[in-house]
């Protein structure tokens, strides 16, 4: 049921974004909407799970819709993203220390509201600085390499993640963004039992590269 609801919501937002694209001119006009499909790769980890480094590769696929403000505002654009995201963490078996391997996969829907400021970066030209907050809803979490049967009940279904990004237009049809995000709240539920995998609380942490496809110039 959750997966079907998520698919319906993605479809609705996609239809809205495509509708916004109709009638867009060759220049970005203030007080106008835009919509752009996005896809990205994510190197993630879960701080507090006793693994180190960005050890789990994930992804995000979704849609960004935005509204362009006048140049006199603090933000040039207010943008909303709706994405299907896979995060998690992974640790390989170490024969020297005999630590157990695990591979946590968390699939969730994420809705982000962000402000974007366009600034000049010298020879690099204009770049976008983005700061936003992502509201997350956990759809499914599983352990595929270790043994943790209670993992689904240990993790909270709802969460908050901060994201900061730097973006640039690299072609007529493509923007690229390098982003970093971190949980505002622990990803564990309040009723989670003590577990050796995450004794001090866990926080989603990730860096990624996302491409946004332009239909407007």
What role is predicted for each listed range?
Residues 75, 83, 87, 161-217:
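Predominantly the C-terminal beta-signal and adjacent terminal strand-loop region
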């Amino acid at each position: 049921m959750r997966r079907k609801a998520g698919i319906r919501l993605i479809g609705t937002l996609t239809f809205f974004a495509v509708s916004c694209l109709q009638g867009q001119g060759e220049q970005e006009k203030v007080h106008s909407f835009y919509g752009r499909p996005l896809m990205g790769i994510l190197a993630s980890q879960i701080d507090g799970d006793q693994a180190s480094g960005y050890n789990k590769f994930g992804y995000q696929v979704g849609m960004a819709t935005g509204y362009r403000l006048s140049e006199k505002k603090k933000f040039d654009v207010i943008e909303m993203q709706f994405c299907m995201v896979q995060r998690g963490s992974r640790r390989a078996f170490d024969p020297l220390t005999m630590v157990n391997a695990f591979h946590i996969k968390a699939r969730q829907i994420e809705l982000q509201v962000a402000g974007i400021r366009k600034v000049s970066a010298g020879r690099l030209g204009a770049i976008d600085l983005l700061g936003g907050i992502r509201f997350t809803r956990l759809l499914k979490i599983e352990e595929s390499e270790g043994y943790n049967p209670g993992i689904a009940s240990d993790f909270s279904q709802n969460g908050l993640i901060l994201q900061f990004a730097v973006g640039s237009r690299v072609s007529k049809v493509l923007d690229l963004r390098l982003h970093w995000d971190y949980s505002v709240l622990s990803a564990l539920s309040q009723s989670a039992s003590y577990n050796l995998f995450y004794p001090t609380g866990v926080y989603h942490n990730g860096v990624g590269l996302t491409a946004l496809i332009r239909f407007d110039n």
